[in-house]
């Protein structure tokens, strides 16, 4: 089922820096049939569960999270890099290969009792997704799990996400 999607993801060597093979998902997005197949697959995984909010991780997570939220009848919210959200936020810091990064969430975006799904395009090391999950927990909400278009399994990112459900449409 995902063969057409896999075929549209292209490898771009040495991007954004030498030694990295970047997974370019833009051909998936530009083809309406493939894009619909991806969204339908995401929705199919979570349709039987009560999802109150879907969080999209900046920035490509937004592309998938918004239509998933719409299809599930859930709210859509975003986590962004520091200083990009206009209202009061909470911040979660996470480790990068060289240094650290951070994500922010509006303090009123989710709350106690909300059942939350976190969505991003690619699961690599798990640092960014894990930070988003910790933001959910800090707000007293329930983390249902994570969904990704692709997982780079050789980086073992799912291990960084604890016991949460991890749903990846494709594995590389």
From Swiss-Prot:
EC number: 2.4.2.7
GO molecular function: adenine binding; adenine phosphoribosyltransferase activity; AMP binding
An individual GO BP term: AMP salvage
Pathway: Purine metabolism; AMP biosynthesis via salvage pathway; AMP from adenine: step 1/1
InterPro entries per the UniProt record, alphabetical: Ade_phspho_trans, PRibTrfase_dom, PRTase-like, UPRTase/APRTase
Family matches, as PROSITE patterns: PUR_PYR_PR_TRANSFER (PS00103)
Enzyme class (EC, first level): transferase
GO cellular component, one term: cytoplasm
Domain of life: Bacteria
Main location: cytoplasm
Transmembrane helix found in the keyword field: no
Keyword set, alphabetical order: Cytoplasm, Glycosyltransferase, Purine salvage, Transferase
Catalyzed chemical reaction(s): AMP + diphosphate = 5-phospho-alpha-D-ribose 1-diphosphate + adenine
Cellular compartments annotated: Cytoplasm
Pfam family membership, one: Pribosyltran
PANTHER family reported in the protein's UniProt record: ADENINE PHOSPHORIBOSYLTRANSFERASE (PTHR32315:SF3)
Xref: NCBIfam families: apt, PRK02304.1-3, PRK02304.1-5
Role this protein plays: Catalyzes a salvage reaction resulting in the formation of AMP, that is energically less costly than de novo synthesis.
Quaternary assembly: Homodimer.
HAMAP family named among the record's database cross-references: Aden_phosphoribosyltr
Similarity section: Belongs to the purine/pyrimidine phosphoribosyltransferase family.
Protein name from the UniProt record: Adenine phosphoribosyltransferase
Organismal lineage: Bacteria, Pseudomonadati, Myxococcota, Myxococcia, Myxococcales
Gene that encodes it: apt
